[in-house]
Amino acid sequence: MAIIEEARSGQITDEMKEISKLEGIPVEKVRNRISECKIILIRNAKYPSKKLVPIGKGLTTKVNINIGTSDEVVNLQMELEKVKVANRWGDTLMDLSTGGDLDDIRREIIRASELPVGTVPVYQVFIESFKKKSGGAYFTEDELLSTVEKHLKDGVAFMTIHAGITKELAIRALKSNRIIPIVSRGGDMIAGWMIHNNSENPYRKHWGYLLEMFKEYDAVISLGDALRPGATGDAHDEFQVGELLETARLVKSALKEGVQVMVEGPGHVPLNEIAWDVKLMKKLTGGVPYYVLGPLPIDVGAPYDHIASAIGAAISSAAGADLLCYLTPAEHLGLPTVKQVEEGAIAYRIAAHAGDVVKLGRRVRKWDDEVSYYRGKLEWDNMISRLIDPQRAYQVYTQFGIPKVKACTMCGGYCPMMWAMDQVRKIGSSSSL
C-alpha cells in the first residue's frame, strides 16, 4: 500500500514514527500531513535508500545535489566523487547525466548513493533518439514511458516530469518577447517534441498511466517547471504562472490517486518576489511540497551563483519552501568540479538552516544557541565541534598556529569575551558592585 493510502486509512507506520522522531513533531501530525500530501517521503518503496528523507510542512528544509556527465565531459569517477560529497552534505541527489552510457552511469550512482536518487527521464529518451534517429524529437511516446519505467525499476526515487507545459503554452512562449523563452533543458525537449510532432505533451496524454507506475513503486513525481524564468525580468510572467495553473490541476489528480507529488519552482526571481512566489505555489496546489532552484535574485552573479542563489534560497526556505536545489560556482558557465559541488552544497546547507530558524524557530535555533554559548565561554573544542563544518573550522582556527591566549588570532589579548568573563569575575568578587 502507498504511504498516502496508509496515512488516509489511519495507520501509523514505522516510517511515520521514524519521521516523527527525526523531525521532533507528533506522529499523528506526520500521519495527517502525509494523508494530505503536505509531507512526502522521497523514496522508491521497492529499493529504499539508506537515508530516510521526508519533505514538507513543519519539517526541516532539505537540500538536493545535482550531478551528472555532459556530452562534453564524461568522467564517471569524478561523478562518483561528487556522490561522496552529496552523501555528506545533501539529502537528495539527482543524476542529470547527458553523456556516456546513461544506464550504466545511473546505476553506478544509485549504488554509490546513500540518498534517494532522482532523474529527468526525458533526457535519456531524447539523447538516444538523437543518436539513433538523427533527431532528439523523434522518440515515441512508448519509448518515453518505457524509459520512465526503466528508471523506476533501477531504484530511482523521484523524477522530474514536465507535464505542466502544453503545446499552446510552448508555442506562445517561443513567440513571446521573453528575455529567454525556455531555459529548462527537459522542458525544451518536451516543447521541441510537441512542435515537431504537432502533438500534445506526451506526459499529459498518458498521465493516468504515469500515476499507476509511480504508485506501484510509491515513488515521487516532481512536476517540472518547463517555463520557469531564466532571467529575473521574466519572473512571474504569463507563461510561468500559466504552467503553474496547469501543474496545480495535475497535483489534484495525483492526490486523488494516492500518488506522492511535489512541484518544482524557479529559477530567477527578484528578491522582493521570492516569498510570495512560495505562497502563490502553496495556495494553488493545496500546500504540497515545493522544490525550488535557488532562486537566483540576480542574473550577473556567475561564477558566484552559489552565493547569490543561497540568498534567495534562504528567503524561500523561510517562506515555506521544502527542498532546495543547490547551485554551484559553475552554474551558467560549465560542468562543476567536485570542489565546486562541495562549495554549492555547503552554501545551501547554510541557506536551509537560515530559513529554518525563521520557519521552525526554537526547534532548530537551539543549535545556534549552543554554538553561541560556547563561543562566549571561549570553549573552542565545544564550539568548533558543533559548527556546520568542524574540520574546516579547526583549520581556520589554527591557520596561524594555536593562539597564545585563550582567544583566537583575530582579537588575541583584546578579545571582548575574554575581558567580559574577567569583568564578571571581578563583579562577583566585589562587595561594592
Curated annotation (Swiss-Prot):
Pfam families: ThiC_Rad_SAM
Cofactor(s) essential for the protein: [4Fe-4S] cluster
An example Gene Ontology molecular-function term: metal ion binding
Source species, domain of life: Archaea
Binding site for Zn(2+): H268, H332
Any one biological process term the GO annotation gives: thiamine biosynthetic process
Pathway, per record: Cofactor biosynthesis; thiamine diphosphate biosynthesis
Transmembrane segments: none
Residues at which [4Fe-4S] cluster binds: C408, C411, C415
Cofactor note: Binds 1 [4Fe-4S] cluster per subunit. The cluster is coordinated with 3 cysteines and an exchangeable S-adenosyl-L-methionine.
InterPro entries xrefs: ThiC/Bza_core_dom, ThiC/BzaA/B
Keywords for the protein's UniProt record, in alphabetical order: 4Fe-4S, Iron, Iron-sulfur, Lyase, Metal-binding, S-adenosyl-L-methionine, Thiamine biosynthesis, Zinc
Keyword DNA-binding recorded: no
Binding site for substrate: N66, M94, Y123, H162, S184, R185, G186, D225, A226, L227, R228, E264, Y291
EC numbers on record: 4.1.99.17
Catalytic activity: 5-amino-1-(5-phospho-beta-D-ribosyl)imidazole + S-adenosyl-L-methionine = 4-amino-2-methyl-5-(phosphooxymethyl)pyrimidine + CO + 5'-deoxyadenosine + formate + L-methionine + 3 H(+)
Keyword Nucleus: no
Record-stated family: Belongs to the ThiC family.
Function: Catalyzes the synthesis of the hydroxymethylpyrimidine phosphate (HMP-P) moiety of thiamine from aminoimidazole ribotide (AIR) in a radical S-adenosyl-L-methionine (SAM)-dependent reaction.
Protein name: Phosphomethylpyrimidine synthase 1
Organism of this sequence: Saccharolobus solfataricus (strain ATCC 35092 / DSM 1617 / JCM 11322 / P2)
Lineage per the UniProt record: Archaea, Thermoproteota, Thermoprotei, Sulfolobales, Sulfolobaceae
